[in-house]
Every structure is written in C-alpha cells, then in structure tokens.
Design a protein with these regions (language model features):
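Non-catalytic terminal regions of proteins
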Residues: 9, 45-49
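Post-HEXXH active-site segment of zinc metalloproteases
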Residues: 80-84, 96-124, 131-134
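Surface-exposed helix-capping loop/turn segments at secondary-structure junctions
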Residues: 35-43, 98-100, 129-136
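Short active-site segment of divalent metal-dependent hydrolases/proteases
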Residues: 87-95
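Active-site scaffold of zinc-dependent metalloenzymes
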Residues: 49-80, 97
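Zn2+-dependent metallopeptidase catalytic core
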Residues: 18-42
C-alpha cells in the first residue's frame, strides 16, 4: 500500500479502498495503540467486515470473547472514521469489561463511563495518523 502514501488522506472515502488496504490501516493503528496506549498480556485480533443490513449501524465493535476488533467498512465512511473506530475499540480491549452490561443497563450507552473514555481516546486520531501515514 506504500504507493498510496501520497494519495491517502483522513478524508479518503473507504469506498475507494480495497478491504486489504483498510486492513493495513487497522493493523497499523493497532500497532500504534500497542506502542502508545499499552497492551494486555494477551493480544488482540482484528477484522474488516461488511455489517449486514438490519444491524444497528456502527463503525466497529470489540468482541470480548473472541478478543477481536471489527471494523465495518460499509459504516466507517472515511480513513478518519476507521482510525477513530480502532482507537475506540482498542480502548475497550484495554478495559475491564466484566461489569460493562450491568453498568449499561443502569446508565445507558451515552453516559457509560467506559464509552466516555473510549470516545475521549478517539481524539488521538490525528496523532496516530501523523505516525502511521508514513507506513501506508
């Protein structure tokens, strides 16, 4: 993907990218997270998928049981959205999610403290992009 280096921007639509290209962005973002945010004793896997019609729209999700970050290419419209989704879901990977659903039922998604933390971490997208874009 290095040949795209000069053509790839945060505003580049994911519709213009192949799945392997998006996978590379996800992989480099996770590597950046491991270096800058830390990691657990077990790693995290990732995949780029198309979310079927009828599901609640989301840029991505973290599957705690499979230890996998999924990015949904049909809902993450730009490179920026992909990076933000990975930062958000990587934060969940780092969190203790044992009481996540219990807290969710009490306060809802928008006020959930772990979701708030993940949304704050999304703001690192610019710093992350500055570091990873040279590797793409």
């Amino acid at each position: 993907m290095s040949y795209l280096c000069n053509m790839l921007y945060l505003k580049t639509p994911t519709a213009e990218l192949t799945t392997p290209m998006i996978r590379t962005i996800v992989c480099e973002t996770i590597r950046w997270c491991e270096t800058n945010l830390g990691a657990k004793s077990y790693g995290v896997d990732y995949s780029v998928r198309t979310l079927p019609v009828g599901y609640t729209p989301a840029y991505g999700m973290y599957d705690y049981n499979k230890r996998t970050i999924m990015v949904f290419r049909n809902y993450a419209p730009t490179v920026k959205a992909v990076i933000r989704a990975v930062l958000h879901e990587y934060t969940h990977y780092l969190q203790n999610l044992r009481w996540y659903n219990h807290t969710l039922s009490k306060v809802g998604y928008n006020k959930h403290p772990q979701e708030r933390e993940a949304r704050v971490m999304e703001e690192l997208y610019s710093q992350c992009w500055g570091d990873i874009r040279v590797k793409l």
